[in-house]
């Protein structure tokens, strides 16, 4: 019996509902079984049985009120004499709360209705049971048993009260929205105190959960306390408990406890105002202990690196509240915050030497997310007493900058390890200054004085920029510490530009530029921007092997070019003119001899050029911008593409970027290829496409099949077909011109593309998704716009192509089957218009089609049969598209048409 009930657990999880009485019987049976045999069962069996009961309860919650008796039945377990039954009851409640809090496989709306009903009726009662159990088990049982009621309390406090589930991958959560009915419990001092008591007297596993409960209690919504005294009393209990932990340090040697305690401290300023903290009698003692704890944490940066964030967040929120403080009570932040700021900066500087000595591969400077997290709160702390903080930073940076400058003048780098340490320390200082300049918030001093201090700090970094690319430092671009420094400088430039570069910033930041003029001769933002662009050019030239620096540099350059004001300013700069004049490698490639084109240097340069051009082509979304690119390429630089594809047709690493660029270049998106009526550019573009396709196809067909046939041949073939398809259906070429003037461009392109497509077996076409999409897209274009070319083929080739269309109809890809249906519709419509219903003499193409069908009379009926089978027996998502060729095929199939007419007249 029990085995059969357990087997229902899987169907239940997939919402396979059974009659209500069956579910009730199973739930009651399991509860009774646990009551009789539970203490003798293995733990995993008890857990599975409880999960089953909770799942049944949730799925039957609104079906019968008897399902809700589970809370009472669990409470009955607590009243039994056996200690084992007591903990089984706690486990039932624990899993019940968890089950009600997760959606499982049921609809989200139904889940929320059940969860809200459970929350309103039973969650408070269960939380009260957990508190009662905590008091009862405080000294009667071992530590392992005390964890059960604590876990139950934590699960109750972690319940999704308002339908906004917390991201389980993140430690951050917002306010805990406890219902108003929970107010008496929170106002009871014993509620908070019991968790502090459990923290003191239990092992680390239990004490960590006690702190987690306190973190959630500290996060309850402010409005749950109707009166200020009750909120103050609640805050006082939290501060008193944390003060005692800070004084004794009990449990903080465990990393889990330490981390949760930092989270608890971080929640104080999230839910409580600074004025409320000041109203607590022992605030001065408490804030002093928190400051001391923070300073020690900063010194133990290796052990507490992930926890310091919450402490710094607390202090940053405290200092940002000072301007709004109306109380005369001293906040003591003037004495504590500078020490914390200096402690953080010192710990970062010292961490470089320690990391280097330990040969640590996990460096914070390489992790952007962790670095951002650590520096997020620092600007507010530094600007609280900006003058003192800036002096402290400058006093640390000046000797390092001087030593780094002296090293640049030496003939050799000297001790490379020592130089790497200096670069690492400078990197941290640059990151710190960049973070400070990112936030322009005045706390305790005027805007003008802050600008002067910003100028002092920025001047040191700008001076460092001038040194990094001189002397022996210009030989160290491959060194990791130098690359980290390069990334830090780019972040500084990005933040500084956003704050102080631009017309509006220029007029509102006169004090800063006046000071920079005195220190470095940078008297306005145009001169400063020129220096920034010069650094960008240097990075692009020297950091070619460091992808991170290049990527960040290009992002900065894009940001400058995309800005309304900075984009205009860039055009005035000498550095920009130099980059524009010297950025292109195409001129050098055009002059390269054929033999030299085989070298790796030339190949890599060409590959990079094609990828860059493809990116540019993707960004040209208007006629004007596309015209600029077209005029730059044609006619002077198109021979380079033809030369490359002719010489390197057997090297897909060269041809693939080239063909992908052309595939993007010929795409008429947003009507960007709409030329003037007197312009031949559309025809000229297609001629260049034809040359490339013919040059590539004539060579690729001669190559033998290798082991990687897709990479060596098929990939280039499908991209070529995509290029030609886009050019044929781009609606910017009048193709009749080619035949009229005897130009073979169209005929040669169609001929070689068909040969390439026929060289691939049908099984391979269907096996490779990208190849099949390109092939059937190409065939659809041929049948819709160039059907005469298809009809002039020999009969076997024609029948093979039509047979591939039938195979495409049977495929699972609706896009491909739609393309096949469209091609068949075009063919059948041509047959009907030019043969079945033709008035005049048939054209040569019509005669060829009639000859093909005469030799294979079952061709059209077989396709019609296939279409009917798909529509009738398969659940196709494109039935409308598949139905279009059916009418055309019926109209050209005389026997079928007569049969349908007779059937229509039968009564």
Tell me the role of every PLM-derived stretch.
Residues 1, 13-14, 732, 783, ...:
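Intrinsically disordered terminal tails
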Residues 1-6, 26, 42-56, 85-97, ...:
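Extended HEAT/HEAT-like alpha-solenoid repeat tracts in very large eukaryotic scaffold/adaptor proteins
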Residues 253, 264, 273-276, 289, ...:
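Long alpha-helical scaffold regions
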């Amino acid at each position: 019996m029990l085995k059969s009930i357990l087997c229902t657990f899987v169907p239940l999880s997939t919402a396979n509902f059974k009659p209500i009485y069956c579910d009730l019987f199973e739930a009651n049976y399991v509860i009774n079984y646990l009551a009789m045999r539970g203490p003798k069962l293995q733990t995993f069996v008890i857990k599975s049985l409880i999960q089953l009961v909770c799942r049944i309860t949730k799925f039957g919650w609104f079906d019968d009120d008897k399902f809700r008796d589970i809370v009472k039945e669990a409470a009955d377990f607590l009243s039994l004499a056996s200690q084992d039954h007591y903990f089984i009851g706690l486990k039932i409640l624990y899993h019940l709360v968890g089950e009600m809090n997760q959606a499982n496989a049921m609809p989200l709306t139904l889940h929320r209705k059940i969860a809200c009903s459970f929350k309103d009726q039973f969650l408070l009662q269960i939380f009260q049971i957990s508190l009662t159990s905590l008091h009862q088990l405080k000294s009667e049982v071992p530590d392992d048993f005390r964890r059960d009621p604590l876990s139950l309390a934590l699960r109750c406090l972690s319940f999704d009260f308002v339908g906004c589930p917390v991201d389980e991958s993140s430690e951050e959560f917002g306010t805990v929205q406890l219902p108003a009915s929970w107010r008496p419990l929170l106002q009871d001092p014993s509620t908070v105190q019991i968790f502090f008591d459990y923290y003191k007297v239990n092992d680390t596993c239990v004490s960590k959960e006690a702190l987690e409960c306190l973190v959630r209690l500290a996060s309850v919504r402010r409005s749950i306390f109707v009166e200020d005294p009750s909120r103050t009393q609640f805050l006082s209990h939290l501060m008193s408990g944390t003060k005692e932990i800070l004084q004794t340090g009990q449990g903080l040697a465990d990393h889990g406890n330490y981390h949760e305690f930092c989270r608890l401290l971080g929640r104080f300023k999230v839910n409580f105002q600074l004025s409320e903290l000041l109203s607590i009698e022992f605030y001065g003692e408490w804030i002093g202990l928190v400051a001391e704890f923070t300073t020690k944490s900063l010194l133990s940066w290796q052990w507490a690196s992930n926890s310091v964030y919450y402490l710094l967040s607390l202090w940053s929120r405290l200092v940002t509240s000072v301007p709004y403080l109306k109380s005369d009570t001293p906040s003591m932040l003037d004495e504590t915050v500078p020490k914390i700021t200096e402690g953080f900066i010192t710990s970062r500087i010292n961490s470089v030497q320690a990391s280097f000595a330990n040969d640590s591969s996990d460096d914070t400077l390489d992790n952007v997310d962790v670095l951002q997290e650590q520096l997020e709160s620092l600007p507010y702390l530094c600007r609280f007493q900006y003058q003192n903080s800036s002096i402290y930073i400058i006093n640390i940076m000046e000797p390092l900058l001087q030593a780094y400058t002296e090293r640049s003048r030496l003939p050799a780098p000297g001790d490379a390890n020592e130089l790497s340490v200096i670069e690492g320390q400078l990197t941290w200082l640059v990151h710190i200054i960049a973070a400070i300049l990112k936030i322009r918030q005045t706390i305790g001093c005027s805007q003008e004085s802050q600008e002067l201090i910003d100028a002092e700090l920025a001047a040191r970094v700008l001076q460092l920029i001038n040194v990094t690319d001189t002397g022996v430092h210009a030989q160290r671009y491959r060194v990791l510490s130098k690359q980290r420094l390069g990334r830090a400088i780019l972040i500084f430039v990005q933040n500084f530009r956003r704050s102080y570069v631009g017309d509006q910033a220029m007029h509102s930041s006169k004090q800063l530029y006046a000071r920079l003029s005195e220190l470095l001769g940078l008297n306005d933002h145009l001169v400063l921007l020129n220096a920034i662009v010069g650094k960008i050019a240097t990075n692009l030239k020297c950091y070619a092997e460091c992808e991170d620096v290049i990527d960040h540099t290009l992002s900065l350059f894009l940001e400058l070019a995309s800005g309304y004001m900075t984009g205009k300013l860039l055009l005035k700069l000498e550095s920009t003119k130099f980059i524009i004049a010297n950025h292109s490698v195409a001129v050098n490639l055009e002059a390269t001899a054929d033999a030299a084109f085989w070298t790796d240097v030339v190949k890599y340069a060409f590959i990079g050029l094609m990828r860059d051009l493809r990116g540019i082509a993707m960004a040209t979304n208007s006629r004007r911008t596309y015209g600029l690119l077209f005029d730059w390429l044609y006619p002077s630089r198109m021979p380079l593409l033809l030369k490359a594809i002719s010489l390197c047709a057997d090297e897909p690493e060269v041809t693939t970027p080239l063909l992908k660029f052309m595939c993007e270049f010929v795409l008429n998106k947003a009507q960007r290829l709409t030329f003037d009526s007197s312009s031949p550019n559309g025809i000229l573009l297609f001629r260049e496409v034809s040359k490339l396709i013919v040059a590539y196809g004539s060579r690729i067909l001669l190559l033998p099949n290798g082991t990687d046939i897709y990479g060596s041949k098929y990939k280039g073939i499908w991209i070529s077909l995509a290029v030609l398809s886009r050019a044929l259906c781009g609606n910017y070429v009048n193709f009749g011109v080619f035949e009229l003037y005897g130009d073979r461009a169209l005929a040669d392109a169609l001929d070689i593309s068909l040969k390439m497509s026929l060289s691939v077996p049908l099984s391979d076409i269907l096996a490779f998704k990208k190849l099949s999409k390109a092939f059937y897209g190409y065939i659809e274009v041929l049948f819709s716009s160039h059907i005469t070319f298809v009809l002039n083929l020999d009969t076997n080739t024609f029948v093979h192509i039509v047979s591939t269309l039938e195979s495409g109809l049977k495929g699972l890809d609706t896009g491909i089957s739609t393309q096949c249906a469209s091609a068949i519709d075009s063919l059948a419509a041509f047959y009907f218009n030019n043969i079945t219903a033709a008035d005049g003499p048939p054209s040569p193409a019509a005669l060829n089609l009639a000859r093909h069908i005469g030799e294979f009379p079952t061709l059209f009926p077989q396709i019609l049969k296939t279409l009917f089978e798909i529509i009738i027996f398969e659940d196709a998502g494109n039935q409308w598209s598949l139905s279009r060729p059916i009418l055309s095929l019926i109209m050209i199939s005389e026997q079928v048409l007569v049969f349908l007419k007779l059937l229509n007249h039968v009564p």
